[in-house]
C-alpha cells in the first residue's frame, strides 16, 4: 500500500524530498511531483469519474548521467509504489527474436507482489518471532510424552509448572543471546526453487516452469543441525511465511500495481525512426516495438501468473538522450501518450561540486564512511572538491559526456592507492586537498590518450 506519510505530500514537499538525493533538474522534479500528487487527487474523486482520469505520462529528454533514472527511482521509493525499469532496446516486435513488451507488466506484478509480501511479513514479525522462539525451545527442551493418546499441542498449551519455569528461564537466556552458539536439530522447510535457462522471448514459460517445480517441492522439510544464531532468522522467515495470507497479498499487490505502479522505459530514443533517407532495416523492428508499447500505455489487460493486470492507470515515464533522433521521430500515437515533456540539462562544474557534497548519501560521504570501517579518518578539503569537479567537467567535455557517472571514475582513480593500503593505516587521518588530487590525477588529465582509457 502507498506510504500514508507520503501519499498526501504536496508537490512542493515531494520536490524538497527529491532535492535531498538529486542535485538540480528542478523542472523534471516538478513534473514527477505533480504526476504523483495527481494520483492522490484521482483517488479522492467519485468512482465513476475516477476511472475516466488517466495518468499524464512523462517523457524525459537529456544526456546520460544527469539524473533521469534516479528521479524516477526515488519517486517510486518515496511513494512506496511498485516500480520497474526497462530498456526499450531489450524488446523487439512480436515475431522477432527478443522479449515481449508485455513482460514489462509481468515484471511489475512480480515486483508488486514481492513488495506487499515483505510488508505483510513485517506486520506479523512479532508473532513470527514468538513462534520461532517456541520451536527453538521445543528443540532445546523436548516435551515429555504421556503414553498412548498423548497430544503434543495440548501439552504445549498446558505445560507442567516445572516445564514452564524452565522454559521461562531458557527463553530469557535465548533473548539475551546466551544460547546463540548452542547447536540444535530442526526440521527446516526446503526451498524447491530451480534455475531454468530460457531462450529470449520465452521468459514467461521459464517462470511458469519454476513455479511448477516450486509447488511440487512445497511443504517438504529436512532435518538440519544449526547454531541457534543461524537457525533463528530461518525460522522467523518460515513462520512469517505461514502467517501471511498469500491470497490477500496477491489481491492487494495487483490493485497497487494497477493504481500506483510506475514503469520507467529508458532509451526510448533508440526505438525511434531516425530520419527518412538511408534508414536501416532495423527501423521496421523499432517501429514495431513502439506499436507494441502503445496498447500498454493506452490501457490494456495483461495476463500474469497472479491474475489480469489493467494498465489504464499505470504511470509510464520514458527517457532518452535523443542525440540522433528527435521526440517527433516517435510514431504520432505514442507521442500523444506522453503529453508532459521535460528537458534535463547537462551537468556543469558547479553541479558536480553540489553532487559531491550536498545529497544525503553524497559520494564523498560514502568514501569517508567506507574507509572509516578500516579505521582511516578520510576528509576532503573544499579545494579538493572543487578540483575534482573541474576534472570531471573537463574529461566530460573532451571525451564522451557521461554526466555524474564520471565522478565515480575520477574518485575511484583518486583513492586507488589509499583504498589498497587502508588496512595497514588503521588509526591514521588523511586529508585530501587539491595538491593530492593533482598528484594522483594531474598526469592523466593532461594526457588526452590516458584520460580516454583511464578516466
UniProtKB/Swiss-Prot annotation:
It is found in: Cytoplasm. Disulfide bonds: none annotated. GO terms for biological process: protein unfolding; proteolysis involved in protein catabolic process. Its main location: cytoplasm. GO terms for cellular component: HslUV protease complex. GO terms for molecular function: ATP binding; ATP hydrolysis activity; peptidase activity; proteasome-activating activity. A double ring-shaped homohexamer of HslV is capped on each side by a ring-shaped HslU homohexamer. The assembly of the HslU/HslV complex is dependent on binding of ATP. This is ATP-dependent protease ATPase subunit HslU. It comes from Xanthomonas euvesicatoria pv. vesicatoria (strain 85-10). The gene is hslU.
Amino acid at each position: 500500500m502507498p506510504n500514508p506519510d507520503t501519499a498526501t505530500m504536496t508537490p512542493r514537499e515531494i520536490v524538497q524530498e527529491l532535492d535531498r538525493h538529486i542535485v538540480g533538474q528542478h523542472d523534471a522534479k516538478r513534473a514527477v511531483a505533480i504526476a504523483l500528487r495527481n494520483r492522490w487527487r484521482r483517488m479522492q474523486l467519485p468512482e465513476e469519474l475516477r476511472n475516466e482520469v488517466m495518468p499524464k505520462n512523462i517523457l524525459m529528454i537529456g544526456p546520460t548521467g544527469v539524473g533521469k533514472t534516479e528521479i524516477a527511482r526515488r519517486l517510486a521509493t518515496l511513494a512506496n509504489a511498485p516500480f520497474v525499469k526497462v530498456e526499450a532496446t531489450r524488446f523487439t516486435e512480436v515475431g522477432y527474436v527478443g522479449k515481449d513488451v508485455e513482460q514489462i507488466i509481468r515484471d511489475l506484478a512480480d515486483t508488486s507482489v514481492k513488495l506487499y509480501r515483505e510488508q505483510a511479513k513485517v506486520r506479523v514479525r512479532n508473532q513470527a518471532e514468538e513462534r520461532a522462539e517456541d520451536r527453538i525451545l521445543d528443540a532445546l527442551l523436548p516435551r515429555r510424552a504421556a503414553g498412548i493418546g498423548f497430544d503434543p499441542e495440548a501439552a504445549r498449551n498446558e505445560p507442567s509448572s516445572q516445564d514452564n519455569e524452565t522454559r521461562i528461564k531458557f527463553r530469557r537466556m535465548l533473548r539475551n543471546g546466551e544460547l546463540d552458539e548452542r547447536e540444535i536439530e530442526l526440521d527446516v522447510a526446503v526451498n524447491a526453487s530451480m534455475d531454468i535457462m530460457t531462450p529470449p522471448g520465452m521468459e514467461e514459460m521459464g517462470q511458469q516452469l519454476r513455479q511448477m517445480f516450486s509447488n511440487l517441492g512445497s511443504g517438504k522439510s529436512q532435518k538440519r543441525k544449526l547454531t541457534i544464531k543461524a537457525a533463528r532468522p530461518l525460522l522467523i522467515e518460515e513462520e512469517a511465511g505461514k502467517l501471511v495470507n498469500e491470497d490477500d497479498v496477491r489481491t492487494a499487490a495487483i490493485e497497487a500495481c494497477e493504481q500506483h505502479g510506475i514503469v520507467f522505459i529508458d532509451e526510448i530514443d533508440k526505438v525511434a525512426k531516425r530520419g527518412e533517407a538511408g534508414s536501416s532495416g532495423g527501423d521496421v523492428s523499432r517501429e514495431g516495438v513502439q506499436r507494441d508499447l502503445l496498447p500498454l500505455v493506452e490501457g490494456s489487460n495483461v495476463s500474469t501468473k497472479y491474475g489480469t493486470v489493467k494498465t489504464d492507470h499505470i504511470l509510464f515515464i520514458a527517457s532518452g538522450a535523443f542525440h540522433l533522433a528527435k521526440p517527433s521521430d516517435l510514431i504520432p500515437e505514442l507521442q500523444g501518450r506522453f503529453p508532459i515533456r521535460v528537458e534535463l540539462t547537462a551537468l556543469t562544474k558547479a553541479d558536480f561540486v553540489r553532487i559531491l557534497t550536498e545529497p544525503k548519501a553524497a559520494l564523498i560521504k560514502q568514501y569517508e564512511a567506507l574507509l572509516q570501517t578500516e579505521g582511516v579518518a578520510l576528509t576532503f578539503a573544499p579545494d579538493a572538491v572543487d578540483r575534482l569537479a573541474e576534472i570531471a567537467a573537463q574529461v566530460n567535455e573532451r571525451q564522451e559526456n557521461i554526466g555524474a557517472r564520471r565522478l565515480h571514475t575520477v574518485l575511484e582513480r583518486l583513492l586507488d592507492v589509499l583504498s589498497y593500503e587502508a588496512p595497514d593505516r588503521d588509526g591514521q587521518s588523511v586529508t585530501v586537498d587539491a595538491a593530492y588530487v593533482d598528484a594522483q590525477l594531474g598526469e592523466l588529465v593532461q594526457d588526452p590518450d590516458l584520460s580516454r582509457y583511464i578516466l
